[in-house]
Amino acid sequence: MSQKRTKSKKNKRKNLLINILAGFLILLSLALIFNSKIRDVIMIWNTNKYQVSQVSKEEIEENKTATGNFDFDSVKSLSSEAVLSAQWSSQQLPVIGGISIPELEMNLPIFKGLDNVNLFYGAGTMKADQVMGQGNYSLASHRIFTGKDADQKLFSPLARATNGMFIYLTDKEKVYKYEIVEVKK
């Protein structure tokens, strides 16, 4: 009798372990299958979170004084792992404005500097001393080549830009209008 109970307990433990392992493998499989979709959802959510409409003029002024990384060589490629890692670090990013190209349906936050996380969710300034509305205003971001609607995320819409389109930048004080005069492919 006691031998049957012992076997029954061992079987229950074994079944529980198998069920936990199977559940883990199913979750891992789903994460791998929906890898780019998960990345895209996080990117869209954070891009919306940092839109210029979500930030006050005072926050923008304060963020303009923040230090930023302007080393273009330190920028890493966009990957799902990097986006997930950045999501878990939950930092407050220095929004200093917004960029919009209505014909391309592009609307992104502008962050100070070229930190990788900045470029995952919007555009980053390339030079520390540039001033919005004065001459050229250099920005960088990523282009995405895979996933649903990849051509509509970050700087990917710029592949469809044409001469004569207008780019609008704002720091919530003024709106600056730039015209695209040359597109190099």
Where are these regions (language model features)?
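Solvent-exposed, non-transmembrane regions of membrane-associated and secreted proteins
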Residues: K12-K185
